């Protein structure tokens, strides 16, 4: 299993610079898709005799004044001259048999069960059931016999006479079968996903197929979801849907979990995947409402300077760029804050807006390169790195030209090696002049990371940290490189340095969780994930639906499912849930102490 912290935590198998991947494990299944879907909140075990659509249609046929199949709006009427008889079971058995016998004459088949199956076939293959206002025609039953119009009388007797007693007997037998199927459905259909999974685990155990590793456990879970036609991610449905439907049927869900004050807003926000930040702020953020004429950018900078909530600062900066789209500093800081929060897509958007306003700010190009790497957009990342190195060291343009001659063929592999030569050459020239640049070392570290040379990447970041020991972002990059180099203990030390410099660095906490998962410390992983969620999920902001929050919850569910093998805790973990309640549940389960934000 591969787990990545931050952007696209579980859906993207590629390793990322400011995020890390669980090592010594296989690539994650594509089952865990990134976008939100409304999934079923309740899963029924499949019926073995009839499909669910057939079963529903048959039950409707039995009911009083019920149409055949869910798509039919009105009961079927048989027009015979001036008389209309409705094909329902509302009248006597004799009347029903009489009407059915009349219908049967239109069909070349005499067996009731055969005709019943053919009606289901037609109902599933076409939409003619929707047009029952039209005169009933023979083609409706898929047979090439008479073609009836609304004024054609249906003969009440036929050469293919049916034994009405036998027909009634068959109908009664079918009714008994239907009732039995309904009871079986009630017995199995009300089971939650967790209960079905527990039963499946018992079956695997009895068959001697218990998982020997976390990877096997994960694969069995995904196979179970697929075989039961359960949504890839059954817990990412909107909170209100989960509360109204799942809570009614799942005894494992405690109502206290819905105590979070902003639960009502999450439903609408979770469906807005584009421009989610700017759309949410003006209607749901108390932070903006409380400004009372104060410049939101000034207030945001005060929060950042004094160690206030960075999620609140993000909301204020979003408001600032909304009021003044030409505010360069607001866009620049918005990109930096979302870097801390782990919202890569918004980082790119903000930095691109800043570059439009000031293309001479080369530091933005380096930051953009990192974000592109995190989104596996290596071509764009290389463009940013080349722009940075060429414009930062114009005195070496002739040297860059000579390097270009060695890489005439244009492809991504050559471009990456060419950029490596650019940065190595500059680093060498600086060393000859007894100089060094932390930016050059950081850029070289990014390139080594893209080449998957993680130990060399870590060496570059260590060199950069000699000049910038208080740069929490560099410490996080060092930790990411070490994690992917399978040096998780060293990585945790780097992450701890980053957290000590910026306690609200969400990406660091999620990366720390990954290293703890690699080390088998699932309690610590859960602790850091919950702490990261608390930073984002502030009841006074509308950040609950941002991408990093959704990904943190997704990773937390995996920790509970795979590390703790607790489907109960996993089912209670989704954006908007009450983290204090989950901590209490976890404490009861493991004797694990609650965690305060550092």
Swiss-Prot record:
TPR repeats: 328-361, 438-471, 472-505, 507-539
Motif WxxxF/Y motif 2 positions after renumbering to this chain: 112-116
Subunit structure: Interacts (via WxxxF/Y and LVxEF motifs) with PEX14; promoting translocation through the PEX13-PEX14 docking complex.
Keyword Ubl conjugation on entry: yes
UniProt xrefs under Pfam families: TPR_16 (PF13432)
InterPro entries: PEX5/PEX5L (IPR024111), TPR-like_helical_dom_sf (IPR011990), TPR_rpt (IPR019734)
Annotated spans, Amphipathic helix 4 (AH4): 193-209
Lineage: Eukaryota, Fungi, Dikarya, Ascomycota, Taphrinomycotina
One of the protein's GO biological processes: protein import into peroxisome matrix, docking
Family: Belongs to the peroxisomal targeting signal receptor family.
Modified residues (Phosphoserine): 66
Annotated region described as Disordered, given as residue ranges: 62-93
Description of its domains: The TPR repeats mediate interaction with proteins containing a C-terminal PTS1-type tripeptide peroxisomal targeting signal (SKL-type).
Biased composition regions of type Low complexity, renumbered to the chain: 80-90
Region (Amphipathic helix 1 (AH1)): 8-30
Post-translational modification: Monoubiquitinated at Cys-7 by PEX2 during PEX5 passage through the retrotranslocation channel: monoubiquitination acts as a signal for PEX5 extraction and is required for proper export from peroxisomes and recycling. When PEX5 recycling is compromised, polyubiquitinated by PEX10 during its passage through the retrotranslocation channel, leading to its degradation.
PROSITE patterns to which the protein is assigned, alphabetical: TPR (PS50005), TPR_REGION (PS50293)
Motif range (WxxxF/Y motif 1): 96-100
Protein name (database record): Peroxisomal targeting signal receptor
S-S pairs: none
Record function comment: Receptor that mediates peroxisomal import of proteins containing a C-terminal PTS1-type tripeptide peroxisomal targeting signal (SKL-type). Binds to cargo proteins containing a PTS1 peroxisomal targeting signal in the cytosol, and translocates them into the peroxisome matrix by passing through the PEX13-PEX14 docking complex along with cargo proteins. PEX5 receptor is then retrotranslocated into the cytosol, leading to release of bound cargo in the peroxisome matrix, and reset for a subsequent peroxisome import cycle.
Example of a GO cellular component annotation carried by this entry: cytoplasm
Keywords noted in UniProt: Cytoplasm, Peroxisome, Phosphoprotein, Protein transport, Repeat, Thioester bond, TPR repeat, Translocation, Transport, Ubl conjugation
Cross-link (Glycyl cysteine thioester (Cys-Gly) (interchain with G-Cter in ubiquitin)): 7
């Amino acid at each position: 299993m591969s787990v990545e912290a931050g952007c696209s935590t579980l859906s993207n198998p590629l390793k990322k610079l400011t995020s890390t991947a669980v090592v010594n494990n296989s690539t994650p299944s594509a089952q865990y898709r990134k976008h939100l879907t409304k999934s079923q909140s309740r899963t029924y075990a499949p019926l073995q005799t009839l499909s669910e659509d057939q079963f529903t249609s048959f039950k409707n046929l039995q009911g009083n004044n019920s149409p055949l199949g869910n798509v039919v709006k009105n009961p079927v009427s048989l027009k015979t001259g001036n008389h209309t008889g409705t094909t329902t079971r509302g009248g006597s058995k004799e009347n029903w048999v009489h009407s059915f016998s009349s219908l049967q004459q239109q069909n070349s088949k005499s067996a009731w069960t055969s005709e019943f199956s053919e009606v289901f076939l037609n109902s599933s293959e076409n939409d003619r059931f929707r047009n029952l206002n039209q005169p009933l025609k023979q083609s409706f039953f898929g047979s090439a016999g008479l073609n009836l119009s609304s004024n054609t009388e249906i003969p009440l007797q036929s050469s293919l006479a049916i034994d009405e007693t036998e027909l009634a007997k068959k109908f009664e037998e079918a009714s008994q079968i239907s009732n039995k199927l309904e009871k079986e459905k009630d017995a199995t259909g009300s089971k939650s996903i967790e209960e079905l999974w527990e039963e499946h685990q018992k079956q695997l155990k009895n068959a001697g197929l218990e998982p020997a590793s976390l990877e096997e456990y994960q694969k069995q879970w995904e196979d179970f979801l697929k075989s039961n036609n359960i949504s890839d991610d059954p817990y990412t449905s909107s909170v209100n849907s989960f509360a109204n439907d799942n809570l009614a049927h799942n005894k494992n869900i405690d109502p206290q979990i819905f105590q979070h004050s902003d639960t009502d807003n999450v439903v609408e926000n979770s469906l807005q995947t584009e421009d989610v930040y700017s759309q949410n702020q003006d209607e749901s953020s108390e932070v903006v409402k409380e400004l009372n004429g104060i410049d939101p950018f000034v207030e945001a900078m005060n929060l950042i300077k004094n160690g206030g909530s960075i999620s609140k600062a993000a909301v204020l900066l979003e408001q600032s760029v909304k009021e003044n789209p030409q505010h360069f500093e607001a866009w620049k800081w918005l990109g930096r804050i979302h870097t801390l929060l782990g919202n890569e897509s918004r980082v790119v958007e903000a930095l691109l807006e800043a570059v439009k306003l000031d293309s001479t700010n080369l530091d933005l190009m380096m930051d953009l390169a990192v974000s592109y790497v995190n989104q596996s957009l290596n071509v764009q990342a290389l463009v940013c790195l080349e722009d940075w190195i060429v414009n930062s060291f114009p005195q070496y343009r002739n040297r860059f030209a000579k390097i270009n001659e060695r890489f005439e063929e244009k492809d991504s592999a050559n471009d990456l090696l060419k950029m490596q030569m650019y940065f190595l050459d500059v680093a060498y020239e600086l060393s000859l002049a007894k100089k060094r640049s932390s930016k050059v070392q950081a850029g070289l570290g990014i390139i080594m990371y893209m080449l998957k040379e993680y130990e060399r990447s870590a060496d570059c970041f260590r060199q950069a940290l000699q000049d910038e020991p208080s740069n929490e972002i560099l410490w996080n990059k060092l930790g990411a490189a070490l994690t992917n180099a399978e040096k998780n203990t060293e990585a945790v030390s780097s992450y701890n340095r980053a957290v000590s410099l910026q306690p609200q660095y969400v990406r660091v906490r999620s990366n720390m969780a990954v290293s703890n998962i690699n080390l088998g410390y699932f309690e610590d992983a859960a602790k850091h994930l919950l702490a990261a969620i608390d930073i984002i999920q502030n009841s006074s902001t509308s950040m609950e639906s941002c991408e990093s929050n959704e990904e943190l919850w997704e990773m937390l569910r995996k920790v509970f499912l795979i590390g703790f093998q607790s489907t109960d805790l996993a089912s209670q973990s989704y954006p908007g849930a009450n983290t204090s309640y989950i901590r209490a549940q976890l404490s009861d389960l493991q004797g694990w102490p609650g965690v305060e934000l550092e």
